[in-house]
Structures are given as structure tokens and as C-alpha cells.
């Protein structure tokens, strides 16, 4: 870092001057590079700037130590990076992509969240307008980090609860899931009668995901081939006019 390099140079200069005379008095309120700068006769502005940098670095190191020891503020679920395909295994890739498309459609602010006003517009477009209190209750039911808005992960929780039958039929979230036209029927391992049935169902889910990925790859190849053919046809058409 530039600060460390400057501090090292100033310390060497101070040491050389100290050999020829008395020690420079320590400046109150300064430490590290700032103290070295002040002792070497650097301008007050330089010493203060270095002191501020030292304090900022110390604060960051203390913050990191607190987090490592579990003292600091925990990271909220909505800010945590997650993989929807592994965390919400009860849904197919197509279902999750449909939910993501719907989420982005109503995330008017493009900030990765659906706030109260955006949820209000969503419910109105779905033909089921809600009261202000009703909207707040909808968010509250899945708001894990208490920030009064829906992250994509919390949005997926709505459909998880709907698929598991955990939503009251007259609740706003149940209405949202029903009117979204996203089929949330699942083929997961819930309700398996035995361990072996659960294993078989888990294997089926895994193979289903592989099939969906292969289908997506084939679709992309098909689109690329069609694009290639269109470009070739266009070039051939151009050549006829030359």
C-alpha cells in the first residue's frame, strides 16, 4: 500500500535524523504512519490524512475480527448469495425461471427487490388489489430479514409455502401464487413412505434436472444454427446485388 511505503520511508528518515540528534517528540492523537510523518516534519495535513487512514484500517481489521468471532451483525438472508436451483430443489428449472421472470417484471426499480408500491402494482395487475395493511402482511409473512421488501429468495418462499399448502386460502400470498399462472406442483421427496422411495424420488429429481439442462443446451444449439443459416442466406442475397 502507498501508506505503508510512505510510512517506511519516513521511519528510515526519522532513524537517520535520530542518529544525529535527539528524538522527535511524539505527536498526540497520531499513530503508525501518522506519527512517523509528524516526527519527520511532514505538513500537518499529511500527518492528519495518514492518521485517518490508520484509524480506518484499524476499524476494518476490528470489524473483520468481530465477524470471525461471530460478534458482528450477521449477513441477512436476502443479501446472501444463493443458488435457487440447489436451495429450492422441489421446483424444476423451468418453474424457477418463470418465477424469476415474474419477479424481474415487477421489480420496477431494478434493485433486486419488490417493495410495497411494486407489490401493490403487481396485485392490481393480477386483478386482486390489496389494502395497505394487506400488502404489509404479505411481505411480513416471508420477510426473513425484516427490511419490509421482498428479495428474490423471499419471493421463491411464497411459492414454496404455496406448494406445501402452508398458506391460508384467503391470504394475499395464496392469491398471488394462484394468479401467477406458475404451476407449483412439485415432485420432490416429501411424502415418501420409506427411505428407499425417497432415494428413488431424489434420483428422479436429479435426472429431471439433467434432462432440462440438456434440453436448454439443445435449444441454444438450435437457435445458433438457425442464426447461422440466416446469416448465410443474407450473405448469399447480398452477393446477387454485387
UniProtKB/Swiss-Prot annotation:
Q: Where is the EF-hand domain?
A: 94-129, 130-165
Sites where Phosphotyrosine occurs are at 85
* Protein localization: Membrane raft
Its keywords, alphabetically, are: Acetylation, Calcium, Membrane, Metal-binding, Phosphoprotein, Repeat
In the record, what terms sit under GO molecular function?
calcium ion binding
- Give residues annotated as binding Ca(2+) 2: 143, 145, 147, 149, 154
| Principal location listed in the UniProt entry | membrane
Give residue spans, biased composition: Low complexity. Answer: 32-42
State the GO CC annotations: membrane raft
Q: Which residues carry this modification: N6-acetyllysine?
A: 235
Q: Which Pfam families match?
A: AIF-1
Where along the chain is Ca(2+) 1 bound? Answer: 107, 111, 118
Per the record, residues carrying Phosphoserine are 11, 76, 78
- Spell out the residue ranges making up region: Disordered: 1-53
N-acetylalanine is found on 2
Q: How does it assemble?
A: Interacts with CASP9; with inactive form.
Record function comment: May regulate B-cell receptor (BCR)-induced immature and primary B-cell apoptosis. Plays a role as negative regulator of the canonical NF-kappa-B-activating branch. Controls spontaneous apoptosis through the regulation of BCL2L1 abundance.
Q: What is this protein called?
A: EF-hand domain-containing protein D2
Annotated source species: Bos taurus (Bovine)
Amino acid at each position: 500500500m502507498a501508506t505503508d511505503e510512505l510510512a517506511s520511508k519516513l521511519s528510515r528518515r526519522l532513524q537517520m535524523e535520530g542518529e544525529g540528534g535527539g528524538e522527535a517528540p511524539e505527536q498526540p492523537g497520531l499513530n503508525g504512519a501518522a506519527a512517523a510523518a509528524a516526527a519527520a516534519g511532514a505538513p500537518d495535513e499529511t500527518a492528519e490524512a495518514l492518521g485517518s487512514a490508520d484509524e480506518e484500517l484499524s476499524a476494518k481489521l476490528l470489524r473483520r475480527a468481530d465477524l470471525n468471532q461471530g460478534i458482528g451483525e450477521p449477513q441477512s438472508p436476502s443479501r446472501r448469495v444463493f443458488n435457487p436451483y440447489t436451495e429450492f430443489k422441489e421446483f424444476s428449472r423451468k418453474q424457477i425461471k418463470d418465477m424469476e421472470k415474474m419477479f424481474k417484471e415487477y421489480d420496477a426499480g431494478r434493485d433486486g427487490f419488490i417493495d410495497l408500491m411494486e407489490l401493490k402494482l403487481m396485485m392490481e395487475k393480477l386483478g386482486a388489489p390489496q389494502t395497505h395493511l394487506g400488502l404489509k402482511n404479505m411481505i411480513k409473512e416471508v420477510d426473513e430479514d425484516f427490511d419490509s421488501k421482498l428479495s428474490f429468495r423471499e419471493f421463491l418462499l411464497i411459492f414454496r409455502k404455496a406448494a406445501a399448502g402452508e398458506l391460508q386460502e384467503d391470504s394475499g400470498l395464496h392469491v398471488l401464487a394462484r394468479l401467477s399462472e406458475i404451476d407449483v406442483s412439485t415432485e420432490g421427496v416429501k411424502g415418501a413412505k420409506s427411505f428407499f422411495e425417497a432415494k428413488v424420488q431424489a434420483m428422479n429429481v436429479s435426472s429431471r434436472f439433467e434432462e432440462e439442462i440438456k434440453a436448454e443446451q439443445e435449444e441454444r444449439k438450435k437457435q445458433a444454427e438457425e442464426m447461422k443459416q440466416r446469416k448465410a442466406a443474407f450473405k448469399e442475397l447480398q452477393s446477387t446485388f454485387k
